Structures are given as C-alpha cells and as structure tokens.
Amino acid sequence: MAVYTDITEDELIRFLAAYEVGSLTSYKGIAEGVENSNFLLHTTKGAYILTLYEKRVNADDLPFFLGLMHHLAERGLSCPLPLPRADGKLLGTLSGRPAAVISFLEGMWLRKPEAQHCREVGRALASMHQAGEGFPLKRPNALSVEGWRPLWRNSEARADEVQAGLKDEIATELAFIEEHWPKDLPEGVIHADLFPDNVFFLGDRLSGLIDFYFACNDFLAYDVAICLNSWCFEKDGSYNITKGMALLSGYESVRRLTAEEIEALPLLARGSALRFFLTRLYDWLMTPPGALVVKKDPLEYLTKIRFHRAIVSSAEYGLRREEAPA
C-alpha cells in the first residue's frame, strides 16, 4: 500500500490548475513504493505521476531531490522530470502535504535481470554520476559510515533473536569498517538506492532511473558497490561474476574507476552490505505488526557481508583491466 493520503477529485483539479498539464480525465493510486503517496494521472495532455510526500520524508530535503531530477533530466539522463508550477516552483501543497507533479516514465522493472541488463545499469549509473556534476545543492549521506553505529545501537540488544552470535559478529564488523573506511575518493551526487525496482526497462533497453529520494553526496564508487550488492547476487546468495563483470564494464565504458576506487571497492561493497543489513535489521525488529513498512530479511545481507569479507581483489567482482604494453 502506497497511498497514505487520499485526495478528492475537486481538490486535485484545483491543484492541477497551477500546471500546464491539460484537464484531468482520470486518476488512481499506485501500490508501488513505501515512502510517499503516489497517483497516476491521465489528462488531455498525457500521463503524469503525482507524489504527496509523507512524514517519513524530510520536507527540507525536497528541493535537493526535485532540483536534482531536473538537473539530471536537463543533461540528458532518462529520469522523471518534476514539472514547474505557474509560479516557477517545483513543489506545491495538496491535502496538507508537499506535492509535486512528475513526468511519466515508460517501462517496468525487471524481476529477473540478466547480464546485459546489468551492463546497461552500469552505463546509466556512470552517466548519472557525470550528469550530476555541477549540481549546486548538497545533501550529506545520513546512511553512510557515520550513521551506522546509531542504527546498530537501536538493534544491538536484540540482534541474537534473529541469529545466534549475530551481536558479536556485527559489532566486530562495524568496528573494522569504521577503522578502515576509505578517505579522499572521488565524490559527487549518488543515487544510493539503485535496486532493480528503481530501474525501468522497455524490453532489454533501459528506459530510465527512478526514486531519487535517497540521493546524496558521497563516494561515487560507493554507488557502484551498492549496485554490485543489489544486481549481482542470485537468490541462493551466490555472487554472479558474469553480472558483476557486465555491470563494471558498463560503468567503465562511461567513467573509468581510479586506482584508489578499485582498491577500495571490496571495503565499499562490504560497507554497503552492512548499511542495508542494519536498516533491514532495524525494521525487522522494531516494526509493529500491521505497519505499512514491508519488512525484508536482513540475513540476505549478512550473507553478502560474509562474501565481501573474503574478497582480496576487485578482480573477484569481475573487474577486468588490460595491462598497458611494456
């Protein structure tokens, strides 16, 4: 369920009068997503998405998110484009919530992505990193290494309810990552949540990236690590090096990783796995029955943490570099 706030047809028509989208012909709630209320609108000029931003989203972050989408779309990245109101602003108010009208993106997310899709994702991620250059607003990553210990404190006492020995294992893991987390890697705007359900395809062609509501400023290679975790593991927990090779080669066809990024990639992947483990663990333990948050199994990411812990070189992820001739 992703419609937390209902709207009436009359108030929607009044709201849309500030946009050049034609007359409303129909609208319906969209069940995808968990953070906001989303509606598919049909008007005499086409299809649009209406998003009402709920309390889980910090309203102070909305200028960053909407401005970023506008910036990326203007630079050729295929992503939803927030439409300006008559007053030039990208944000209005509907049913007491901040609200925006966003262009409709054709496509659907893949339930079973293959290597060729991973290559397209790598290309698109690198294109996003390049398109994000020059975006003037900044948003620190609240879910990077500095934010993991507060998350862990909230779940630590009950961790062994999920698996025996988990408390000690994660405490050791977190301490190691905090001590060894890299510094001075190339930074920029990252998506930070580019899971398969945030990438649309039309057939085998990538049609666009969506859901920029975790976007922030951080290491570019950390975004690559998130994608390795979210695109390149199979349901049985095994790493698919063919998918990894495709994703990394796709990324490097647009933006080449530095030597420092390549060296740091195993630790970034390990940290990325820990980040999603910790948020899943918190929701698993703290979400009351009947809540709208969909709980996801944290142990999926524990398996990934253990895999990355054994990695010695980025080549084990599928990164291939030809040596220069002597």
Curated annotation (Swiss-Prot):
Alphabetized UniProt keyword annotations: Amino-acid biosynthesis, ATP-binding, Kinase, Nucleotide-binding, Threonine biosynthesis, Transferase
Catalyzed reactions per annotation: L-homoserine + ATP = O-phospho-L-homoserine + ADP + H(+)
Pathway where this protein functions: Amino-acid biosynthesis; L-threonine biosynthesis; L-threonine from L-aspartate: step 4/5
Annotated family: Belongs to the pseudomonas-type ThrB family.
Record-listed E.C. numbers: 2.7.1.39
Taxonomy of the source species: Bacteria, Pseudomonadati, Pseudomonadota, Alphaproteobacteria, Hyphomicrobiales
One GO BP: threonine biosynthetic process
GO MF annotations in UniProt: ATP binding; homoserine kinase activity
HAMAP family: Homoser_kinase_2 (MF_00301)
Gene it is expressed from: thrB
Full protein name: Homoserine kinase
